[in-house]
Amino acid sequence: MKKAVVLLSGGLDSTTTLAIARGNGFACYALSVDYGQRHAAELAAATRIGQLLQVCEHQFLKLDLTVLASSALTDPSVTVPIHGTNRGIPATYVPARNTIMLSLALAWAEVLGSQDIFIGVTAVDYSGYPDCRPDYIDAFEKMANLATKAGREGNLLKVHAPLINLPKHDIIRRGLELGIDYSMTVSCYQADASGWACGQCDACHIRRAGFAAANIPDPTYYQDKR
């Protein structure tokens, strides 16, 4: 069975991506990163999801990006914008986050002898991050094969982004087909310690709209529904 490293945040998209990789016959090795994000409940969700989907191994890395990057996701003094107030790249953008995450996944893939990395980015229903686009994924894959021993020896690495062209409602439908319980996932940028979502940020809006478009009841725990 081929090995794959799957970046798992604990959110809806990364959980669906893990289920897709598993469904495609990969032995999945999950990688979650604590980069100082304020929505730490997402990492607790990642733990539960990794166990439920029976990953072969689950690594948690601590990498404090708060000293390098000012973002609403890492700096409590920066307000998480309410949906609809963003212009251009939002305050929730964490500089180079996906590049850092993919680089860590790449390093572990080399150690494992894996040629496959999965990431749950989408360029359809997203907040405008530059590192969620198809040309970015293609560029990283090219770099990975130029910069690694595996690539130089002809064992080419593939960065899989199976959700890249899917709207949120199709992602949700695909995940449900694979048996995902989305109530276990946390997407909110400012979820509380129990994982209850604010219902106002971009992530909450996109998630809520996705379930509505899929005509499926939203199982998310919202703070205003307590």
From Swiss-Prot:
Chain sites annotated for binding ATP: L8, S9, G10, G11, L12, D13, S14, T15, T16, T17, L18
Required cofactor names: Zn(2+)
UniProt cross-references to Pfam families, sorted A to Z: QueC (PF06508)
Gene Ontology terms describing biological process: queuosine biosynthetic process
Metabolic or biological pathway, per its Swiss-Prot or TrEMBL entry: Purine metabolism; 7-cyano-7-deazaguanine biosynthesis
EC number per UniProt: 6.3.4.20
The record's free-text note on cofactor binding: Binds 1 zinc ion per subunit.
UniProt GO molecular function: ATP binding; ligase activity, forming carbon-nitrogen bonds; zinc ion binding
Positions annotated to bind Zn(2+): C188, C198, C201, C204
Keywords: ATP-binding, Ligase, Metal-binding, Nucleotide-binding, Queuosine biosynthesis, Zinc
Function: Catalyzes the ATP-dependent conversion of 7-carboxy-7-deazaguanine (CDG) to 7-cyano-7-deazaguanine (preQ(0)).
Annotated family: Belongs to the QueC family.
Annotated protein name in UniProt: 7-cyano-7-deazaguanine synthase
Species per Swiss-Prot/TrEMBL record: Nitrosomonas eutropha (strain DSM 101675 / C91 / Nm57)
